Curated annotation (Swiss-Prot):
Organism: Ehrlichia ruminantium (strain Gardel)
Cofactors (names): pyridoxal 5'-phosphate
Xref: InterPro entries: PyrdxlP-dep_Trfase, PyrdxlP-dep_Trfase_major, PyrdxlP-dep_Trfase_small, Ser_HO-MeTrfase, Ser_HO-MeTrfase-like, Ser_HO-MeTrfase_PLP_BS, SHMT-like_dom
Taxonomic lineage of the native organism: Bacteria, Pseudomonadati, Pseudomonadota, Alphaproteobacteria, Rickettsiales
HAMAP family: SHMT
EC number(s) given by UniProt: 2.1.2.1
UniProt xrefs under SUPFAM superfamilies: PLP-dependent transferases (SSF53383)
Localization per record: Cytoplasm
Role this protein plays: Catalyzes the reversible interconversion of serine and glycine with tetrahydrofolate (THF) serving as the one-carbon carrier. This reaction serves as the major source of one-carbon groups required for the biosynthesis of purines, thymidylate, methionine, and other important biomolecules. Also exhibits THF-independent aldolase activity toward beta-hydroxyamino acids, producing glycine and aldehydes, via a retro-aldol mechanism.
Gene: glyA
GO biological-process terms attached to the record: glycine biosynthetic process from serine; tetrahydrofolate interconversion
Protein name: Serine hydroxymethyltransferase
Length: 421
């Protein structure tokens, strides 16, 4: 009998790919991960995502598939939906979107017509590409109007947003961001939306784990529809979800995702999401979320003590954004220097940034991944000082900079050797 599938392990079948995966594992273990949109998933999540469900095509929804053999696919998707609804206190949910961008596009397809007016946060002030940015479909297919933050405080100006809404009469208002570290007044957003007859979309991609744990305001009472990724503070596999308490909106979203935006769902990823949602329902996840915020506030404290300008003056979440202009350093130069020494973050635009997007005047840090690893305030205090040492070294002599870099490499290794992924 001839079989055309292999029973051999990856390391025996494809040494090139196996080496790349091994190298990436070593990189994650040996560096400090401070990118706000990344996290470390559990072994159980990895096992579910690498499961036999990767073989199954399950086009459609539970109980209404286009293919046979979907009994267990239905069970696993229903588990994911039930756990998600319990986690966020919502009535309806779609767990099939492949990404946060597709989740947002699915909402647009469900609720808007091309040319409708959409109000969202501008990219440089902390918004996401899908919130109406010009290069995105959201900026090309719709009349996108962007709100900004207050120039002096860096905070969302709700009065300015209300004036914008009254002036432009949008069909949809988006509350949410990708680099705004403060709480969001979802109640006020809904009041503004009601004044102009608009839908309110809350994009909580960055804050979802904190919302689920009660450490960040929940939009469930106010938003018509909520989107989120599942791989940031929620600590699940990559992908996204859509939630609502409105059955009429739910039905529109179901058809906009399938067959509107996607074909077959990724059942192995949905299985992994179900595991992650189950983990987030456990009491210890609340402790994890609390520690995330303690750690980010520790970074803020150190940065401010060392003379870094923290955008908005602080944080209420996992994110910290710093303005490097007072240091006469660009985000690009700083992030490359940090990466060389094993500290991974991202260059980031600051509000009204004069620099180009691939240069930027700022950095964005996130505490979720290293909190998953077990680091707490004492370790984040050390990280904060290392970051400041590296930034300050960029304006010193070569000899001084080399000495600082060697010291930071040693201190990074001490932390990563102690706290394994």
């Amino acid at each position: 009998m001839v079989r055309y599938i292999s029973d051999y392990d990856l390391q025996d079948v494809d040494t090139e790919v196996f080496k790349c995966i091994t190298d990436e594992s070593n990189r994650q273990n040996s560096q400090l991960q401070l990118i706000a949109s990344e996290n470390f998933v559990s072994k159980a999540v990895l096992q579910a995502q690498g499961s036999i469900f990767t073989n199954k095509y399950a086009e459609g929804y539970p109980g209404k598939r286009y293919y046979c053999g979907c009994h267990f696919a239905d069970i696993i998707e229903n588990i994911a939906i039930e756990r998600l609804c319990k986690l966020f206190g919502c009535k309806f949910a779609n767990v099939q979107p492949h990404s946060g961008s597709q989740a947002n596009q699915g909402v647009f397809a469900a609720l808007l017509k091309p040319g409708d007016t959409v109000i969202g946060m501008s990219l440089d002030c902390g918004g996401h590409l899908t919130h109406g940015s010009a290069p995105s479909i959201s900026g090309k297919w719709f009349n996108a109007v962007q709100y900004q933050v207050d120039r002096d405080t860096g905070m969302i100006d709700m009065d300015a947003i209300e004036k914008l809404a009254l002036s432009h009469n949008p069909s949809l208002i988006i509350a949410g961001s990708s680099s705004y570290p403060r709480t969001i007044d979802f109640k006020r957003f809904r009041e503004i939306a009601d004044k102009v007859g608009a839908y309110l979309l809350a994009d909580i991609a960055h804050y979802a784990g904190l919302v689920a744990a009660g450490e960040f305001p929940s939009p469930i009472e106010y938003a018509h529809v909520i989107t989120s990724t599942t791989h940031k503070t929620l600590r699940g596999p990559r992908g996204a979800v859509i939630m609502t308490n409105h059955e009429d909106i739910y039905k529109k979203i179901q058809s906009s995702i399938f067959p509107g935006m996607q074909g077959g769902p990724l059942m192995h990823v949905i299985a992994a999401r179900a595991v992650a949602f189950g983990e987030a329902l456990k009491p210890e996840f609340k402790d994890y979320a609390k520690q995330i915020i303690k750690n980010s506030k520790t970074l803020v404290k150190v940065f401010q003590e060392r003379g870094l300008n923290v955008v908005t003056g602080g944080t209420d979440s996992h994110m910290v954004v710093v303005d490097l202009r007072p240091k006469s350093v660009t985000g690009k130069d700083a992030v490359l220097a940090l990466e060389r020494l094993g500290i991974i973050c991202n260059k980031n635009a600051i509000p009204f940034d004069p620099e180009k997007p691939f240069v930027t005047s700022g950095l964005r840090f996130g505490s979720a991944a290293e909190t998953s690893r077990g680091l707490q305030e004492p370790e984040f205090e050390k990280i904060g000082h290392m970051v400041c040492d590296v930034i300050d070294s960029l304006k010193t002599t070569d000899d001084v900079r080399l000495s600082i870099e060697q010291d930071v490499i040693r201190r990074v290794k001490e932390l990563t050797d102690t706290f394994k992924v």
